[in-house]
């Protein structure tokens, strides 16, 4: 990325490009490879860290994390029998999970929920929903409700 350097929520980067978006625009973000200060040459800026900065620095009404393999936050990994959707999550609730840093270098579900919790201090509507069901984004924005997990700080 040419506009951001470093990794983590305190990465260096100017978010003003997002301020000039037309009203009622849904900005979609994702992580990317970025330059890093020495001794590192590059790193992966997590989309979760980008969302934390956007939520705290911009006039954000919704923060929606689109998940690729589940309807929202589950009480245990989706491949475990009996995994159930948590419809309302607070940081006091513990979840069973695992993170394979060989596959996901940015923190997996644990970074995602930590980021969502931080965002919920600035943004009322913070959700983790099924990215395979794009109509749920529209449903959430239009009605304030959908199937997934709402995060409360």
Task: Give the ranges of each region predicted by the language model.
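C-terminal catalytic "cap/lid" subdomain
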Residues: 1-153
